[in-house]
Amino acid sequence: MARACMRVGEVLKLTPKDIEDRKAIIRDPKSGKEAEVAFLPQKVADRLHKYISDNGIKPEDRIFPITYAAARVVVKKAGDLVGIHLKPHDLRRHAATYASRSGTPIEIVSKILLRHSSLSITQIYLGKISDVEAIRWIDNLHG
């Protein structure tokens, strides 16, 4: 979820036939037709292909056949292990914030990673930039 900025529901609906090399095809829930594409980092794509192969998952079967509630528990337990309160959507938000703060253009974060319909949604989503961060970027720009 985190590396591809995918929503938990999108991840839970994925089947092997939805994975094309480094793309995850997100289908319209009503028609089943391709609605959006989430791009996968190479390591994620490699691990996902291996997971599908190692577990003998059929092309039409869900890769992660768990409920949303079960996914919440998995993510919560992972957060507990490192001492933070964590929900599935936090992973998507963190990935987008990390990309933005690492210098990825806001247009890429918005349209490609988050697949938002407008930049204004992404700006609200990413939140306010702290004074410390603003100063760091100014220093990076002007040495």
Describe the residue ranges of each PLM region.
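The alpha-helix within a helix-turn-helix
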Residues: 1, 12, 110
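Short pre-functional
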Residues: 1-7, 97-98
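Conserved tyrosine-mediated DNA breakage-rejoining catalytic core shared by Y-recombinases
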Residues: 4-50
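Short, polar N-cap/turn motifs at the start of nucleic acid-interacting alpha helices
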Residues: 19-21, 85, 105-124
